[in-house]
């Protein structure tokens, strides 16, 4: 039988691997070039195609909420340059796993319009009506995850996102699909959430669904195993939802 320390370590590693941008090895970044790691992730994350689904324009102000190592922040930064800004947000729980990558990505002002924004989820500290768009990638299920050092006040968190958006601003959600009708049943252990549940919840909070995409759909995913199972890692069935305030 596994010892308690081993069980705790397994739990910590499982949660760590769920963080967007989590990487087991250090990544090298060069100014003016995208990293080999990011280019490798493009194959399955299809970041460039995702950005084509949203109306990013130069000068916009965007938040990459719980943005992990900053894969999307860098893509966004290029689209909204030269005068736009991206806030790459992470909280204390994420930083032990992505902090080195964030620091390397932003070192020596490599991305001049990306601002590191380390804040807890109960105080995101975005100025009211200051954001044109929020990216929330592979993290929505985490607002239903409860652990010793992780519990989010969902209503307050969503309220903060909505308050930070300008009138007509957009919220982009991408997450690992759970079986239809399962709600949040799979959020705790399998890090997935039912698309219909997310749509219903955000509509109740005053958001309007304006676009869906099947860009990241994978019918071979049973949606009943962890996104980090070797058979499905980085190839999960994922939904893409664009909401408007």
Kindly label every feature range from the protein language model:
Residues 59, 82-84, 165-171:
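Short glycine-dipeptide loop
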Residues 59-68:
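Conserved class I S-adenosyl-L-methionine
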